[in-house]
A protein has these predicted regions:
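Signature of the catalytic double-stranded beta-helix
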Residues: 1-86
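Feature targets compositionally biased, intrinsically disordered low-complexity regions
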Residues: 13-14, 89, 113, 161, ...
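A structural signal for short, well-ordered beta-strand segments and their strand-loop junctions
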Residues: 33-37, 90-91, 102, 144-148, ...
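Short, flexible loop/turn elements at secondary-structure junctions
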Residues: 40, 56-60, 92-96, 149-151, ...
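Catalytic core of non-heme Fe(II) oxygenases with the double-stranded beta-helix
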Residues: 48-141, 177-180
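Catalytic core of Fe(II)/2-oxoglutarate
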Residues: 121-198
Length: 198
């Protein structure tokens, strides 16, 4: 699994799935600075491969003031973003646990100072879906999905047993200036009811 890798490093050190994903990218993406992340999860029904909840990827955050908790100190800066990131996502075995996007246009409410943006906006997106202002779209297996810093999406809980591969490249982000080319050997899952056992 790759974390914060550039294209060349990911291609040279990735397996067949990683190289297939990178080969399928649009040519203009391959020639720009980008950062690649991937994860492989062994999932069981009810497990989440990512923290669930409607959110955006890589919206610039303010520096965290000394002594302040990262959750409230480093909230996304939607008013004056330093950059506007773009991403391409792909899944293998998506049917086990698809990423969902909320498609459509909406205006989100301003959040009070100190409140958590995505905690509040998650509830708002759910209402917008219920009112058919936004529509849910489940990512399909082995497709590329291009989205940007304003595309609401969420991880979902697994509905069956199996392995799931997730890959994402990002550009127009400060992360391309901080590439670390890491290979990670484990990743976590999240449980809704951790004491129920398995």
């Amino acid at each position: 699994m790759h974390f914060n890798s550039d294209f060349k490093y990911a291609y040279e050190n990735g397996g067949e799935i990683t190289r297939s994903f990178l080969d399928a990218l649009p040519e203009d993406w391959k020639n720009e600075p980008l950062v690649f992340d991937s994860r492989v999860h062994m999932l069981m029904p009810g497990w989440y491969p990512a923290i669930p909840g409607w959110h955006h990827d890589d919206v610039p955050r303010a520096e965290i003031p000394t002594g302040q908790h990262f959750i409230t100190g480093g909230q996304p800066d939607y008013d004056n973003p330093r950059y506007k990131s773009e991403h391409i996502l792909g899944l293998v075995n998506a049917e086990i646990c698809p990423t969902e996007f909320a498609i459509g246009n909406c205006l989100m409410p301003k959040i009070k100072e100190g409140d958590l943006i995505y905690r509040e906006w998650h509830k708002e997106v759910e209402l917008l879906i219920e009112d058919n202002i936004l529509q849910k779209h489940e990512c399909e297996d082995r497709y590329l999905y291009h989205f940007d810093w304003q595309a609401f999406h969420s991880g979902t809980k697994a509905i069956s047993n199996g392995w799931r591969w997730f890959g994402r490249v990002s550009r127009n982000t400060e992360r391309v200036n901080k590439v670390t080319n890491e290979i990670r050997v484990n990743c976590q899952v999240y449980l809704e009811f951790p004491m129920e056992g398995w």
